[in-house]
Amino acid sequence: MIDSRDREKILKAISRDECAELTKQLCDIASPTGAEREIGEFILDWYARHGVKPIRQEIDANRINAVGVVEGRGQGTSLQINGHVDTSFTGTEEDRLFCAELEPVSELGGAVRDGKVFGLGASNMKSGVAAFMVAGKALKRSGIELKGDCILAAVAGEISRTPIGPYQSGSYRGEGTGTRHLLTHGVQSDYAICADRSGHSIVWAQNGVAQIRISTFGNPHAAWGMTREQEPPEENNA
């Protein structure tokens, strides 16, 4: 059992600036759905350099899952912290054709200004991935021994694109592809936390998926909720 002194020891080893800089570095690496290999290799190298056991899960020629493990004694339950590294846009100059009017201050790469991190994928969800990477490093360096494994899974293919009809290329293989591959190829845990925004509260995440094709005209964009309820609602809404 980790007591308050152990907890403080770990927290003191976590730097806000390191989290921000690592988020920036992740945003500097283009990782659209279907092309997550480069960022995955970066994460695996980072794990190895900081004493976290790296596990490479091959998905296809262009994508991998990057998993790190802070190993326990094998006498307790395991916990996975999961986050995706793919983004809706490409991270190239092509994006400006679509995003210039919608988000004129957006950065293609990463930037830290006025105490904030900017860049494609910063909020969804490279900041969450950077946070658990830094936390894993701090946990490992603390020397505190866990009973069970702490698994840090940076996965491909979460963005809600699904191969339907003529849309069958790698860029449409999202909707949980990476996590499904993770679980069916040997990386499993007793419990899991998704490193997405939730206001530090327990929230409903997703209770199902409806795949509907709708054709529209105009500037492309995405629809999502930027905030979540502070407490789970009585009705199981996403």
Model-derived regions: residue spans:
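N-terminal helical capping/dimerization or prosegment-like subdomains
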Residues: 2-92, 96-98
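Hydrophobic/aromatic beta-strand patches that form the interior of the parallel beta-sheet core
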Residues: 55, 79-81, 153, 191-193, ...
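Beta-strand secondary-structure signal
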Residues: 67, 151, 211-215
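Active-site metal-coordination/substrate-binding segment of hydrolases
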Residues: 76-151, 160-162
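Acidic, glycine-rich active-site loops and adjacent beta-strand->loop/helix elements
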Residues: 85-87, 116, 153-173, 187, ...
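Short acidic, glycine/serine/threonine-rich loops at helix termini
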Residues: 93-94, 162-167, 204-206
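Glycine-rich, phosphate-binding/catalytic loops in enzymes
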Residues: 96-101, 135, 169-170, 210-212, ...
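Midchain, well-structured core segments that form catalytic/ion-binding scaffolds
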Residues: 173-238
